[in-house]
Regions:
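Catalytic-core segments of class I nucleotidyltransferases/pyrophosphorylases
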Residues: 117-119, 126, 132-139, 151-154, ...
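Conserved beta-strand termini and adjacent loop/short-helix elements that scaffold enzyme active sites
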Residues: 70, 94-96, 148, 219-221, ...
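Conserved N-terminal catalytic core of the sugar/cofactor nucleotidyltransferase
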Residues: 2-22, 29, 43, 47-122, ...
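Short beta-strand-to-loop element that shapes/binds the nucleotide-sugar donor at the catalytic cleft/hinge
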Residues: 71, 146-163
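Residue-level signal for inorganic ion chemistry
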Residues: 50, 76, 109, 124, ...
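Short alpha-helical oligomerization interface
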Residues: 35-40
Length: 251
């Protein structure tokens, strides 16, 4: 593993919890960009999406960030070292392996978290989320893990039908899903690391085991949320930014 410019084996306990940002994936569904650069460096409004994620946390009082890198990680290290961060914001990169799954990446960061609670999220998702409310919800329920859940917009509009005769009653343009999905923006107690192995996919066995044991709670986020999975998503997020009405821009 390799830290970026500011050295130190541990992130000490000062104020808000540290934030782990998962930056290691290959981003294959966004290959128009990711053949040349890692997905976290795909730009929105001229700045990498991971910069937007860090800003979202930093403007709400978080200061310590660990970027778990993998694919083309050297580019992320260079970005972190060369970016002028807000005062008191400390951004470090840790090489967690080329193809290490999400849970394994967090497991590898365990020694650097100094046995304290921490937040975690993905490098490709932005939201108009109040992180102080998320943190208060997490500390209030006294369980090991909190996962933010969202109801994304459906890809297509829907047609409303009369079930009796098939008569079309109306149309709705891209309504929100009726189902809640994982939106990232996690809060974890250090005990979560005991649920992780180096080959763990966070979203599968670890979260499922936490749920079965009653140790996972969901924080519902009803407002804007979007992840950048495809080229179309990247275009949509850039359009929002250029409109001056990007809902995640809280700074």
């Amino acid at each position: 593993m390799s830290d970026r410019a500011q050295q130190g084996d541990r992130v000490s306990r000062e104020g808000m919890p540290p934030v782990v940002i998962l930056c290691g994936g290959r981003g294959t569904r966004l290959r128009e960009h990711t053949q040349a650069i890692p997905k976290p460096l795909v730009e929105i409004g001229g700045m990498p999406i991971v910069w937007h994620v860090i800003q979202l946390y930093a403007v709400q009082g978080f200061e310590r960030f660990l970027l778990a890198t993998g694919y083309k990680g050297e580019s992320i290290v260079r970005f972190a070292a060369e970016t002028p961060w807000p005062e008191n914001v400390d951004v470090r990169c840790v090489d967690t392996g080329l193809d290490t799954p999400t849970g394994g990446r967090i497991k590898l960061l365990g020694p650097r978290l100094a046995g304290e609670p921490f937040c975690a999220t993905y490098a490709d998702g932005v939201a108009s989320i109040d992180l102080s409310k998320l943190l208060a919800f997490h500390t209030g329920h006294s369980r090991l893990a909190t996962m933010t859940v969202v109801r994304p917009e459906l890809q297509f509009g829907v047609t409303e039908l009369d079930p009796a005769d098939g008569r079309v009653l109306g149309f709705r343009e891209k309504p929100r899903s009726e189902h809640w999905i994982n939106g990232g923006f996690f809060c974890f107690e250090p005990g979560v690391l005991d649920y992780l192995e180096h080959d763990s996919v966070l979203e599968r066995d670890p979260l499922e085991r936490l749920a079965r044991g009653g140790e996972l709670r969901a924080h519902r986020h009803e407002d804007f949320w979007e992840c950048m999975d495809t080229y179309k998503d990247a275009v949509a997020l850039n359009d929002l930014w250029e409109s001056g009405e990007a809902p995640w821009r809280l700074w």
